[in-house]
């Protein structure tokens, strides 16, 4: 019996290719910028970003949502809130946030509130900081469930039953940034959105499309406006100490 010393040419080729692939992957990772973790600092003379998000042209003609369950309480139909446009074209329920800010004010002390009310979620759109939590409750005398999912993969985060009016529970949010889609399986028209960010510099537009972000450290930032149907658009803002930077972002209906 003869022993086999050394590797065959095929094995040697495999080892060389695998080593090259590993080196290439490490080089690619090293070339990507690494964002610093958010640092909480005292903001003594911060500025404010104040602005409005508008919808270009006329809002799409959305038809009322047909109610398929609990009509005795929810009614026969519910207005579709996807495009809610106020005076002057102001667009409601747009999440506006600063991009890649690495230090500033502390996270909100209180959990988010997500209420099942009148067979809809309220609020429909809101921001959150990674590491936070959400208080889920129901003001309706019908069975709801609150089912948040990763918006990209549809993976379930958890699924909470709310069996009666006044029921509430507080749950942690995922530990990484991203968009969360919330639905009620019992009432398929019920949707909400939570944008988890690594910092607390975000706001949701009101009925007139207006938003305000306070206590911003001086600097130049990219401001992002995100809407569930119209997509997102960015603006550049320069924040000076103790001053207010104005912004107007216009989205187009899709």
What do the PLM-derived regions correspond to, one by one?
Residues 1-15:
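N-terminal secretory signal peptides that target proteins for export/translocation
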Residues 8, 22-23:
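Short linear/disordered segments characteristic of secreted peptide precursors
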Residues 15-22:
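Sec-dependent signal peptide hydrophobic core
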Residues 35-254:
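Extracytoplasmic copper-binding redox domains, predominantly the cupredoxin/blue-copper superfamily
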